[in-house]
Amino acid sequence: MVGVKITWLGHSAFLLEAEKKLLIDPFISGNPLAPCSPEELNPDIITVTHGHRDHLGDTIEIGKRTRCRIITIHEVANYIKSKGVFAEGMGKGGTVNVEGIKLTMTDALHSSSIDASGFSFDGGSPAGFIIQINGHSIYHAGDTGVFGDMKLIGELYEPELVLLPIGDKFTMGIKEATKAVELILPRTVIPMHYSTFDVIKQDPEEFKRAVEAKVDTKVIIMKPGESIDL
């Protein structure tokens, strides 16, 4: 099994590197935790979980420069295309094979409006992604609260690694994220979407203690710019 390098870019942004490079929710400009500039990123694929600016981020600018493939919910894809960049829309429950990487769109409990130029556009429905790459299954939950079908996601796709928000207020907090881990039962979980701004400040060590007191799942607390290998 060939490895996958995973780098946290702060907030909910991750770069997955194998034969191809997959960039998730590239909120770089305006992200105080970002360890790089948008110009340093040259992905083959971008996935966007929903339309909020801290997830859509620099997708359009990076897409224009690199001509990478962009995969997102249908309505966000239409918005990106309106800016002169091609994007591919898909729906929840569907799977696409992109450059040898299988992407399955899952549900998420959140919202997805796109605020730009003083207007709010319909961003459809928020989502998460199951990413099957080089024999590994990874679940990026997007912005979400905990929901019962996370157990079904765990049973169907058996993700060995889960990327979960813990920031509270706009997503689930530590208590709810711990329950999500109990439902999914992955081998490893990485917390995300916390402490980017004061309003979502959380202690990831508290999350680590809560999870490891409940289940046999390893919690890896990453620093922005840090990488791990699967």
UniProtKB/Swiss-Prot annotation:
Keywords: Hydrolase. InterPro entries: Metallo-B-lactamas, RibonucZ/Hydroxyglut_hydro, UPF0173, UPF0173_UPF0282_UlaG_hydrolase. GO terms for molecular function: hydrolase activity. Gene3D superfamilies: Ribonuclease Z/Hydroxyacylglutathione hydrolase-like. Signal peptide: none annotated. The keyword Hydrolase applies. It holds the Pfam family Lactamase_B_3. HAMAP family: UPF0173. PANTHER family: UPF0173 METAL-DEPENDENT HYDROLASE MJ1163, UPF0173 METAL-DEPENDENT HYDROLASE MJ1163-RELATED. Belongs to the UPF0173 family. This is UPF0173 metal-dependent hydrolase Mbar_A3716. It comes from Methanosarcina barkeri (strain Fusaro / DSM 804). The lineage of its organism: Archaea, Methanobacteriati, Methanobacteriota, Stenosarchaea group, Methanomicrobia.
